[in-house]
Design a protein with these regions (language model features):
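Generic hydrophobic/packing signal
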Residues: 4-8, 171, 183
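Residues in flexible loops and secondary-structure boundaries
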Residues: 30-34, 175, 179-181
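Glycine- and small-residue beta-turn/loop positions that connect adjacent beta-strands
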Residues: 162, 166-168, 174, 180, ...
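Conserved small/polar residues in nucleotide/adenosyl-binding loops
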Residues: 191-192
């Protein structure tokens, strides 16, 4: 019997009003057996984690994820953990079971204000613009929500910044890309899983 490969860590999940996971950011991951619940380290997300929906209709919730790397992906948090492992260089390409990844990830509107759900984007965009205006945080006469992409996979550098690489256009490198040290991604390149 072979030993099950696992990875684990605390992530900060963006959850929409319907309960869908839009994304999960893992600042640190560990390979190996996960600690017992009573021995888990603290997540240290503090005030950036909140159970109240923001103007985007998104709650930011801490999630503790344990991924069985040889088995199919269980949910969006597991999918994001595996994508982080690749981009953090904790796993090499073609060493993780990525079966079912597309079915587990939601299409997301990726913006300069973070992820939005697709179905109510127009209304939530108005809410964000109004909230930003009311907060007094806007110095310009007009605030806008800029859509960067609509996709299942976000830009890698919004989650992981690997050392020793050069990236000419961050929009062309998706989370899950494994960039070895010394890699240069030119503006006309594209890097994905």
């Amino acid at each position: 019997m072979t030993e099950q490969r696992t990875a684990w860590g605390w992530g900060l999940a963006s959850i929409d009003a319907a309960g869908n996971t839009l994304d999960v950011w893992y600042p640190e991951l560990t390979l190996g057996e996960a600690p017992a619940e009573t021995s888990r380290p603290n997540h240290n997300f503090g005030a950036i984690a909140h159970d109240e929906a923001d103007a985007r209709g998104v709650r930011r919730m801490p999630v503790f994820t344990v991924s069985k790397l040889d088995e199919p992906i269980e949910d969006a948090a597991d999918a994001y953990l595996r994508l982080h492992l690749l981009s953090m260089r904790l796993a090499k390409p073609n060493t993780l079971n990525l079966d079912g990844i597309f079915a587990k990830l939601n299409n997301v509107v990726w913006t300069n204000y973070g992820p939005f759900a697709v179905d109510d984007f127009a209304l939530r965009k108005l809410d964000v613009m109004a909230a930003t205006r009311q907060s007094g945080a806007v110095l310009a006469p007009h605030v806008d929500v800029n859509v960067l992409s609509i996709d299942k996979f976000p830009r890698m550098v919004d989650y992981v910044v690997p050392t020793g690489v050069r990236i000419g256009d961050a929009d062309r490198v998706r989370l899950g890309a494994h960039l070895s040290e010394g890699t240069t991604v030119m503006p006309v390149s594209y890097t994905h899983l």
